[in-house]
From Swiss-Prot:
Role summary: Catalyzes the phosphorylation of N-acetyl-D-glucosamine (GlcNAc) derived from cell-wall degradation, yielding GlcNAc-6-P.
UniProt gene name: nagK
UniProt-listed NCBIfam families: PRK13310.1
Keyword Glycoprotein: no
Record keywords: ATP-binding, Carbohydrate metabolism, Kinase, Metal-binding, Nucleotide-binding, Transferase, Zinc
Protein name: N-acetyl-D-glucosamine kinase
Source species: Aliivibrio fischeri (strain ATCC 700601 / ES114) (Vibrio fischeri)
Entry's Gene Ontology BP terms: N-acetylglucosamine metabolic process; peptidoglycan turnover
Length: 303
């Protein structure tokens, strides 16, 4: 039995999956935002409850909006303040008497897609989230790859490439990132970036959904903006694809519902790739909001 926990800023979602990777139990509880001991107790209590229900000790995986320090194991997270700087994996292991896997929630999203029936035989899957922020996860042979310092999936904190700057023009905004650097692609490729760039070029604040609607209606500014953004996506994605050469790319987050992306990227990518580079299959993520808990559970599949 595989147990997955999607630990968010307001709620913890639990899911239990059997050996066929079918979800057989679900539960949601509020996240303890201030009391760390209660946070650990809440997770441990759910584990004990479902161990008793299923008569086995489930394998436990946690997905978090952050990462473990690769040297100390301390948790780096801002969305779950009670756990910031704490040793959640080690403390939970001591509490329940078994090993626990923990990973970034974007890696869990990618892992969930990689273990979909349609993709599970793909040697590599890249998950990219076009949501409030831009992030991603890398899956090789069914396992999440976190790298030496646990930052391998932090694709949003790579910098905007030089040809993207040329594309955006000499008055392109140099945006500061929450990580402390400037020019991180998180601020440009996310849904938030989609809106910020529109406001920068046209002096008008609009929600992404309204820009997309205006584009469909033929509004000149929206049409120009979407064309610029699609080319920006192609330039930045081509950089990532040249580095990692994934077989399949699954897109999630609110902006991934913009169907034009799946028409435009295959046409725009080739000129930005190496001459021998191939455009990977680009699909919309299938598991939506349940992806985090699925992926967390599946951290234990290939021990």
């Amino acid at each position: 039995m595989y147990y997955g926990f999607d630990v968010g800023g307001t709620k913890i979602e639990f899911g239990a999956f059997n050996e066929k990777l079918e979800r057989v139990a679900t539960e949601r509880i509020p996240t303890q935002t201030e009391n760390y001991s209660l946070l650990v107790d809440d997770i441990a209590s759910l584990i004990a409850k479902y161990d008793a229900e299923f008569g086995v000790e489930g394998k436990v995986g946690l997905g978090i909006p952050g990462m473990e320090d690769a040297e100390t194991g301390a948790l780096l997270t801002s969305n779950v303040p009670a756990a910031k700087g704490q040793f959640l994996r080690k403390d939970l292991e001591a509490k329940i008497g078994r090993s626990v896997k923990i990973d970034n929630d974007a890696n869990c999203f990618a892992l969930s897609e990689a273990w979909d029936e349609e993709l599970k035989d793909s040697p590599s899957v890249m998950g990219l989230i076009l949501g409030t922020g831009f992030g991603g996860g890398l899956i090789f042979d069914g396992k999440a790859f976190s790298g030496y310092s646990h930052v391998a999936g932090e694709l949003g904190h790579s910098r905007l490439p030089i040809d993207a700057w040329f594309h955006l023009g000499e008055n392109a905004p140099l945006l500061e990132c929450g990580c402390g650097n400037k020019g991180c692609i998180d601020n440009y490729l996310s849904g938030r970036g989609f809106e910020l760039l529109y406001a920068h070029y046209y002096g008008e604040q609009k929600k992404a959904i309204d820009i997309i609607k205006a584009h469909a209606e033929g509004d000149a500014n929206a049409v120009e903006h979407v064309d610029r953004f699609m080319e920006l996506l192609a330039i930045c994605f081509a950089n990532l694809f040249t580095c990692f050469d994934p077989h399949v790319v699954a897109l999630g987050g609110g902006l991934s519902n913009f169907e034009l992306i799946y028409e435009e990227l295959p046409k725009r990518l080739p000129k930005h790739l190496l001459s021998v580079g191939r455009v990977p299959r680009i699909i919309k993520a299938k598991h939506g909001d349940s992806g985090g808990v699925r992926g967390a559970a599946f951290l234990n599949i290939k021990d």
